Protein backbone atom coordinates (compact mmCIF):
# COMPACT_ATOMS: atom_id res chain seq x y z
CA UNK A 1 0.00 0.00 0.00
CA UNK A 2 2.87 2.37 0.77
CA UNK A 3 5.16 1.21 -2.03
CA UNK A 4 6.83 4.15 -3.82
CA UNK A 5 5.32 6.59 -1.37
CA UNK A 6 7.32 8.75 0.99
CA UNK A 7 6.26 8.30 4.59
CA UNK A 8 7.67 8.61 8.07
CA UNK A 9 7.04 6.08 10.82
CA UNK A 10 6.70 7.51 14.32
CA UNK A 11 5.47 6.27 17.68
CA UNK A 12 2.17 7.59 19.03
CA UNK A 13 4.19 8.40 22.15
CA UNK A 14 6.51 10.70 20.21
CA UNK A 15 4.29 13.05 18.20
CA UNK A 16 6.06 16.28 19.05
CA UNK A 17 6.87 18.25 15.91
CA UNK A 18 5.04 15.75 13.69
CA UNK A 19 2.29 16.89 11.31
CA UNK A 20 1.13 16.33 7.76
CA UNK A 21 -1.73 15.44 5.45
CA UNK A 22 -2.51 11.78 6.20
CA UNK A 23 -1.80 9.64 9.25
CA UNK A 24 -2.19 5.88 9.17
CA UNK A 25 -2.70 4.61 12.70
CA UNK A 26 -1.52 1.00 12.96
CA UNK A 27 -4.13 -1.58 13.84
CA UNK A 28 -3.90 -2.85 17.39
CA UNK A 29 -5.74 -4.14 20.43
CA UNK A 30 -5.53 -0.82 22.25
CA UNK A 31 -9.28 -0.26 22.19
CA UNK A 32 -10.45 -2.55 25.00
CA UNK A 33 -10.82 -2.61 28.77
CA UNK A 34 -7.34 -3.83 29.72
CA UNK A 35 -5.65 -1.72 27.04
CA UNK A 36 -7.29 1.48 25.80
CA UNK A 37 -4.40 3.90 25.43
CA UNK A 38 -5.38 4.73 21.84
CA UNK A 39 -8.25 6.87 23.09
CA UNK A 40 -5.76 9.46 24.33
CA UNK A 41 -3.57 9.37 21.22
CA UNK A 42 -6.18 9.72 18.46
CA UNK A 43 -7.32 13.28 19.36
CA UNK A 44 -3.68 14.40 19.31
CA UNK A 45 -3.13 12.75 15.92
CA UNK A 46 -6.28 14.36 14.53
CA UNK A 47 -5.06 17.78 15.62
CA UNK A 48 -1.84 17.31 13.66
CA UNK A 49 -3.08 15.70 10.44
CA UNK A 50 -5.75 16.61 7.90
CA UNK A 51 -6.80 13.02 7.40
CA UNK A 52 -6.57 10.07 9.81
CA UNK A 53 -7.12 6.41 8.96
CA UNK A 54 -7.22 3.83 11.73
CA UNK A 55 -6.12 0.50 10.29
CA UNK A 56 -8.05 -2.72 11.03
CA UNK A 57 -8.51 -3.14 14.78
CA UNK A 58 -10.97 -4.59 17.27
CA UNK A 59 -13.08 -2.27 19.41
CA UNK A 60 -14.84 -2.88 22.71
CA UNK A 61 -17.46 -0.14 22.83
CA UNK A 62 -18.62 -1.25 26.28
CA UNK A 63 -15.58 0.72 27.50
CA UNK A 64 -16.90 4.31 27.88
CA UNK A 65 -13.72 6.04 26.72
CA UNK A 66 -13.52 3.84 23.61
CA UNK A 67 -17.12 4.55 22.74
CA UNK A 68 -16.85 8.30 23.28
CA UNK A 69 -13.63 8.58 21.27
CA UNK A 70 -15.15 6.75 18.31
CA UNK A 71 -18.33 8.83 18.55
CA UNK A 72 -16.35 12.06 18.15
CA UNK A 73 -13.55 11.07 15.80
CA UNK A 74 -13.38 12.29 12.20
CA UNK A 75 -11.07 9.41 11.26
CA UNK A 76 -11.89 6.64 8.83
CA UNK A 77 -11.98 3.61 11.12
CA UNK A 78 -11.45 0.03 9.94
CA UNK A 79 -12.71 -2.89 11.99
CA UNK A 80 -11.06 -6.28 11.48
CA UNK A 81 -14.09 -8.41 12.28
CA UNK A 82 -17.86 -8.22 12.05
CA UNK A 83 -18.67 -7.76 15.74
CA UNK A 84 -16.54 -4.62 16.01
CA UNK A 85 -17.88 -3.26 12.73
CA UNK A 86 -21.48 -3.75 13.81
CA UNK A 87 -20.69 -1.99 17.10
CA UNK A 88 -18.92 1.05 15.61
CA UNK A 89 -20.73 1.65 12.32
CA UNK A 90 -23.27 3.94 14.00
CA UNK A 91 -20.58 5.81 15.93
CA UNK A 92 -18.10 6.81 13.22
CA UNK A 93 -17.10 6.48 9.56
CA UNK A 94 -16.49 2.74 9.68
CA UNK A 95 -15.31 0.13 7.19
CA UNK A 96 -14.37 -3.53 7.57
CA UNK A 97 -11.22 -5.24 6.31
CA UNK A 98 -8.90 -8.10 7.20
CA UNK A 99 -6.23 -7.56 9.85
CA UNK A 100 -3.00 -6.41 8.21
CA UNK A 101 -1.31 -9.64 9.34
CA UNK A 102 -3.18 -11.39 6.52
CA UNK A 103 -1.07 -9.50 3.97
CA UNK A 104 2.33 -10.54 5.32
CA UNK A 105 4.45 -12.88 3.17
CA UNK A 106 4.67 -16.06 5.24
CA UNK A 107 6.26 -18.18 2.50
CA UNK A 108 9.80 -18.19 3.96
CA UNK A 109 8.39 -19.73 7.15
CA UNK A 110 6.26 -22.49 5.66
CA UNK A 111 7.39 -25.78 7.22
CA UNK A 112 5.91 -29.09 8.34
CA UNK A 113 6.02 -28.80 12.11
CA UNK A 114 5.95 -31.25 14.97
CA UNK A 115 4.27 -31.15 18.34
CA UNK A 116 2.07 -28.57 19.99
CA UNK A 117 2.85 -24.95 20.83
CA UNK A 118 0.86 -23.78 23.86
CA UNK A 119 0.92 -19.99 23.74
CA UNK A 120 -1.64 -18.33 25.98
CA UNK A 121 -1.52 -14.76 27.20
CA UNK A 122 0.11 -14.05 30.56
CA UNK A 123 -1.09 -10.45 30.88
CA UNK A 124 -4.20 -8.68 32.14
CA UNK A 125 -6.18 -9.52 29.00
CA UNK A 126 -6.14 -13.24 29.83
CA UNK A 127 -9.28 -14.80 31.28
CA UNK A 128 -7.68 -18.14 32.11
CA UNK A 129 -7.58 -18.94 35.81
CA UNK A 130 -4.74 -21.41 35.34
CA UNK A 131 -1.91 -21.23 32.80
CA UNK A 132 -0.57 -24.62 31.62
CA UNK A 133 2.96 -25.39 32.80
CA UNK A 134 4.05 -25.87 29.19
CA UNK A 135 2.87 -22.39 28.23
CA UNK A 136 5.14 -20.22 26.08
CA UNK A 137 3.74 -16.70 25.62
CA UNK A 138 5.80 -15.98 22.51
CA UNK A 139 4.39 -12.49 22.02
CA UNK A 140 6.13 -11.52 25.26
CA UNK A 141 9.20 -13.76 25.20
CA UNK A 142 10.41 -13.63 21.58
CA UNK A 143 12.90 -10.87 20.84
CA UNK A 144 12.07 -10.47 17.14
CA UNK A 145 9.35 -11.13 14.59
CA UNK A 146 11.63 -13.70 12.94
CA UNK A 147 12.00 -15.67 16.18
CA UNK A 148 8.25 -15.42 16.79
CA UNK A 149 7.40 -16.78 13.34
CA UNK A 150 9.94 -19.61 13.46
CA UNK A 151 8.59 -20.68 16.85
CA UNK A 152 5.15 -21.07 15.31
CA UNK A 153 6.50 -22.64 12.11
CA UNK A 154 8.24 -25.55 13.78
CA UNK A 155 5.04 -26.81 15.44
CA UNK A 156 2.08 -28.69 13.95
CA UNK A 157 -0.62 -27.56 16.39
CA UNK A 158 -0.98 -24.20 18.12
CA UNK A 159 -3.20 -23.45 21.13
CA UNK A 160 -3.61 -19.77 21.91
CA UNK A 161 -5.79 -16.87 22.97
CA UNK A 162 -3.70 -14.30 21.09
CA UNK A 163 -5.14 -12.94 17.85
CA UNK A 164 -1.93 -12.65 15.87
CA UNK A 165 -0.59 -16.01 17.01
CA UNK A 166 -3.86 -17.51 15.78
CA UNK A 167 -3.70 -15.68 12.45
CA UNK A 168 -0.05 -16.47 11.76
CA UNK A 169 -0.46 -20.11 12.75
CA UNK A 170 -3.48 -20.53 10.49
CA UNK A 171 -1.72 -18.93 7.52
CA UNK A 172 1.29 -21.16 8.14
CA UNK A 173 -0.94 -24.20 7.79
CA UNK A 174 -1.09 -25.19 11.45
CA UNK A 175 -4.06 -26.67 13.26
CA UNK A 176 -5.21 -23.95 15.64
CA UNK A 177 -7.20 -24.37 18.86
CA UNK A 178 -8.18 -20.99 20.27
CA UNK A 179 -9.85 -19.55 23.31
CA UNK A 180 -11.05 -16.03 23.97
CA UNK A 181 -9.33 -13.23 25.84
CA UNK A 182 -11.24 -10.62 27.84
CA UNK A 183 -13.47 -9.50 24.97
CA UNK A 184 -14.76 -10.66 21.59
CA UNK A 185 -11.60 -10.08 19.50
CA UNK A 186 -10.22 -13.61 19.00
CA UNK A 187 -13.45 -15.55 18.28
CA UNK A 188 -14.73 -12.70 16.10
CA UNK A 189 -11.59 -12.70 13.94
CA UNK A 190 -11.78 -16.48 13.65
CA UNK A 191 -15.42 -16.30 12.58
CA UNK A 192 -14.91 -13.45 10.09
CA UNK A 193 -11.58 -14.32 8.49
CA UNK A 194 -10.54 -17.90 9.27
CA UNK A 195 -13.57 -20.04 8.47
CA UNK A 196 -11.74 -21.84 5.66
CA UNK A 197 -8.77 -22.72 7.89
CA UNK A 198 -8.33 -25.57 10.43
CA UNK A 199 -9.18 -23.26 13.32
CA UNK A 200 -11.51 -24.31 16.12
CA UNK A 201 -12.67 -22.97 19.45
CA UNK A 202 -12.23 -25.29 22.41
CA UNK A 203 -13.34 -24.91 25.99
CA UNK A 204 -10.77 -24.22 28.74
CA UNK A 205 -11.25 -27.59 30.42
CA UNK A 206 -10.47 -29.30 27.10
CA UNK A 207 -7.40 -27.13 26.64
CA UNK A 208 -5.97 -28.05 30.01
CA UNK A 209 -6.77 -31.73 29.60
CA UNK A 210 -5.08 -31.83 26.18
CA UNK A 211 -2.13 -29.72 27.27
CA UNK A 212 -1.45 -31.69 30.45
Name each region found by the language model.
Residues 1-212:
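Active-site anion-handling motifs in enzyme catalytic cores
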Amino acid sequence: MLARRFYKEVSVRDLGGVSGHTALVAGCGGWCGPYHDMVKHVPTIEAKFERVIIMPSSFDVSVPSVRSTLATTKALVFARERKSFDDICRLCDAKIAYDCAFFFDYRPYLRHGDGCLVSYRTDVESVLSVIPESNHDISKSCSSLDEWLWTIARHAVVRTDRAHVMIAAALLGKVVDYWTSSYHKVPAIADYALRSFPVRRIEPENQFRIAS
